[in-house]
Amino acid sequence: MTVQVQDHDITTAADTAKLPQPMQPPLKQATYKTHTTDFIVNELLPLEFTGEGEHLWLHIQKSGMNTAYLAKLLSEWAEIPLRDVGFSGLKDRHALTTQWFSLRIPKKQLPDSEFAPVDISANESVTILEQQWHNKKLNRGTHRANQFIITLRDIEFASFEASLSLQISASEQPMSAKQAVEQHLTTISQSGVPNYFGPQRFGRSGNNIREALSLFARPVPESRPQPNKGKRKRVPREQNSMELSAARSLIFNEILAARVRDGSWNTGLAGEVFNLDGSGSIFASDEIDHTLRARLETGDIHPTAVLWGTSNEKVSGKAAAMETDIVAQSPLLMQLAVGLEQRDIKAQRRALRLPIEALSWEWEDKEDGQILVLNFTLTTGSFATSVLASLVQELITSSYSRS
């Protein structure tokens, strides 16, 4: 019998601010996204263009609109099908972002007018920074990383006791609140942070999880026979990708939270599946030996957890038992897991640890108080909010980005 999941349970589970951290965040409170330029995202896509071909690549800076909407505007301008517009990743609407788009334009017949959409609001802007011809379309997931420049305002430091916890020894002079923040930043630049999925994955108050439960309550669509072939074709999942991703992400976050609580998120367990840093390569190990410990300490490899689905055979031992136990103890997670399996979603692995590249920071004194500007790079598929959550106990989103 299926246990009824309470609406409050969904809201609570989707609240990423309540997820545990390995260290006490040194900032009690801060506000971000007060202005568009407080959250800057630059897509890092090293590429040598051929200078020829039928794909026009545009390097675009935008704000106030999401990536999918801009792709639609570009297709209308070029008078091409939306499927002929390519981009690598989705960028935040409430940010100043730069990313590449590709437009398949046969015979290089460009529109008569420059791209300058007129039906956009005062809060929306689009600027073409560069254009190149290339012989290939830009496919999803092509870029390797994103650079973030994030400004935190209205900063309130954590208690003096929390600052003391970051001292190296009791004999040292007590740290100032600002020094405690800088020590924390230095530490996470070396050790990384828990690789949680961010709140945007779950929608407002967890609505994407509610949509997933609604989807899983419906009959599973039957596969259709392919003409002249013995195989059966699965029903496309693109239309439900948001719900499926939210379900897998919530299960992953809960497993990672348990690993943070027991301290194994960056050390591994028996039967662990490891991810090779900077790649999609994984390998399993029955035990954690000296060599693996050394590689974990240097950040060469990372422990992983499951993105739930079928065929999850690689993990074993204590690591496997922990994953299944966490799901079994929660009616919400159980319903999500069963729904994913019934739709034949194949299990994948995701690193538990998120390395932070090129982390730097700068303090600025303003009339209304100090602000902290962070500059760092994260691999594709990770969330800047995971870095902010490790630093700030209560991160307040400005009313600008909630509009």
UniProtKB/Swiss-Prot annotation:
Its EC number is 5.4.99.27. Keywords: Isomerase, tRNA processing. One of its GO terms (molecular function) is RNA binding. It catalyses: uridine(13) in tRNA = pseudouridine(13) in tRNA. The keyword tRNA processing applies. Residues 192-354 form the TRUD domain. Residues 1-24, 217-240 are annotated as: Disordered. Residues 1-10 have a biased composition (Basic and acidic residues). The active site is at residue 92. SUPFAM superfamilies: Pseudouridine synthase (SSF55120). GO terms for biological process: tRNA pseudouridine synthesis. One of its GO terms (cellular component) is cytosol. The lineage of its organism: Bacteria, Pseudomonadati, Pseudomonadota, Gammaproteobacteria, Moraxellales. Belongs to the pseudouridine synthase TruD family. This is tRNA pseudouridine synthase D. It comes from the Bacteria. It is an enzyme of class 5 (isomerase). Responsible for synthesis of pseudouridine from uracil-13 in transfer RNAs. Pfam families: TruD. It comes from Psychrobacter arcticus (strain DSM 17307 / VKM B-2377 / 273-4).
